Amino acid sequence: MKDCCGGYESEELLMDFSGKDKAAYVQDTFNSIAKRYDVMNTLMSFGLDKGWRKKAVQTVEAKPGMTMVDICCGTAQLSLELAMTVGEQGQITGLDFSENMLKKAQENLAGSPYRSIIELRQGDAMNLPFADNSFDGATVGWGLRNLPDLEKGVQEMIRVVKPGGMVVSLDMAKPTMPGFKQGYWLYFNKLVPLMGKIWAGKAKAYQYLHDSAVEFPSQQELANIFARCGLTETRYQNLAGGVVAIVSGRKPR
């Protein structure tokens, strides 16, 4: 079929969840790759991931003293970037449903001066354990594509953000530059699973990361979903030629 990158032919993807529902499969997948997740992210992004996280923190309009939530926080790298901005008077809550990712997050926070303002919780992004209007803003990094119901996940983020607050997603996107996009998808289709096999011993897990990125909506489509869910000022910012994008919107005041 033609993929959503615009004309690059690939085999139709039917993600194999090994007899499990998507939520259980994704949870098992991230539990299995948690120990080497940060190293693999840096390798796959050629070290650009830190800068992308900083840009997401700017987009969510984090400021000193704010209270923010980081959904699908994983190893807490984005949570840490948020904490550096909100400072000691602020508070960050990171939520993830992978126990092993949260264990790795605890290790990452152990020597951080921001540990005291970051609370890590295991929970379900489809049913956030927070009251309405609890946070000044919400982020999700490389997480929405793993949810069984993307729109419900976005709606939950909107629910827990205060009126006027920002909802921000940082995730894989669909590059559009001719020539570049074909090379990128070849890299992501062939080399990323190979890297996962060599450095993490988890080729199948990294094949899922490829497949889920291909099936994830384009940055424009995700911005449209944000608007459909009720956010205003929806937009996207392409990073690295559209390989990654930040999609954002504001909860109406």
Curated annotation (Swiss-Prot):
Pfam family, one: Ubie_methyltran
Pathway info: Quinol/quinone metabolism; menaquinone biosynthesis; menaquinol from 1,4-dihydroxy-2-naphthoate: step 2/2
Key words, A-Z: Menaquinone biosynthesis, Methyltransferase, S-adenosyl-L-methionine, Transferase
Molecular function (Gene Ontology), one example: demethylmenaquinone methyltransferase activity
Gene Ontology biological process: menaquinone biosynthetic process; methylation
UniProt-annotated binding residues for S-adenosyl-L-methionine: 75, 96, 124-125
Annotated TM spans: none
InterPro entries: SAM-dependent_MTases_sf, UbiE/COQ5_MeTrFase, UbiE/COQ5_MeTrFase_CS
EC class of the enzyme, as a word: transferase
UniProt EC number: 2.1.1.163
Annotated function: Methyltransferase required for the conversion of demethylmenaquinol (DMKH2) to menaquinol (MKH2).
Annotated HAMAP family: MenG_UbiE_methyltr
Family the entry assigns: Belongs to the class I-like SAM-binding methyltransferase superfamily. MenG/UbiE family.
Stored NCBIfam families: MenG_MenH_UbiE, PRK00216.1-4, PRK00216.1-5
Name this polypeptide is given: Demethylmenaquinone methyltransferase
